[in-house]
Amino acid sequence: MLKFIIGKKIGMTQVFDVKGNLMPVTVVEVGHCVVTDVRTVEKNGYSAVQLGFGEIKEKGLNKAQAVFFKRNNLSYKRTLKEFRVSEVAGFSVGHEIKADAFKAGDYVDVSAVTKGKGYAGVIKRHNFGMQPVSHGQSDRTRSRGSSGAQGPQKVLKGLKMSGHMGNEYVTVQKLLIVNVDAEKNVLLIKGSVPSANRGTLFISSTLKKIPKVLVAVVHKGTKVKKK
């Protein structure tokens, strides 16, 4: 069954696995996610579950949003997100999803908006190499070089150039959940995830093929300190 939840990125830290290897992890506070709507094939043409995350005052919503929450007797939520599922049985409006929906050893896909870097050159944005710094060249060391050939006599579309970097919605697939603190609603996810600290993350069971041999995870007694 597909698992999903919405969380907030706290930051990164390090933990030791059962073999004593140091492992970088991202601390994610997944909070109390409430089912705000259930989509069915008969009514909507597809199956999905909508979750709400984070509190917000009524003045931060438009009229249609406020009426939606009042009609369903729900508290106002800052973030709403639909997750496609094959079967909606077991989900109902008001149902709460917490960190204990996952367990250590699960693989997840994490989606979020990346950090905005502003206008960036090709070296930072596309990992280009620098130009030679010898033979009198002093003002083009970070240039991309020629942007077109003599034959077409024009710049072709799709070339890698400087421009706005970051602030894009991306998904990182097949990340390992190292530990779950159900009491504090915290997940430890191996490696880095997109988004700045305190950014919203959308977490769901991975669509990638799961390896047969899982890596060793953190001891169950490991305590997680929240900032």
UniProtKB/Swiss-Prot annotation:
Q: Which UniProt keywords apply?
A: Ribonucleoprotein, Ribosomal protein, RNA-binding, rRNA-binding
Please list the GO biological process terms of this entry. Answer: translation
Question: Which SUPFAM superfamilies does the UniProt record give?
Answer: Translation proteins
- Molecular function terms from GO: rRNA binding; structural constituent of ribosome
Q: Does Ribosomal protein appear among the keywords?
A: yes
Show the segment(s) annotated as Disordered.
129-154
Q: Which Pfam families match?
A: Ribosomal_L3 (PF00297)
Q: Which GO terms describe its cellular component?
A: cytosolic large ribosomal subunit
Q: What does this protein do?
A: One of the primary rRNA binding proteins, it binds directly near the 3'-end of the 23S rRNA, where it nucleates assembly of the 50S subunit.
Q: What protein family is recorded?
A: Belongs to the universal ribosomal protein uL3 family.
Q: Assembly and partners?
A: Part of the 50S ribosomal subunit. Forms a cluster with proteins L14 and L19.
Q: Quote the PANTHER family the UniProt record gives.
A: 50S RIBOSOMAL PROTEIN L3 (PTHR11229), LARGE RIBOSOMAL SUBUNIT PROTEIN UL3C (PTHR11229:SF16)
Q: What is this protein called?
A: Large ribosomal subunit protein uL3
- Tell me the organism: Endomicrobium trichonymphae
What gene does this protein come from? rplC
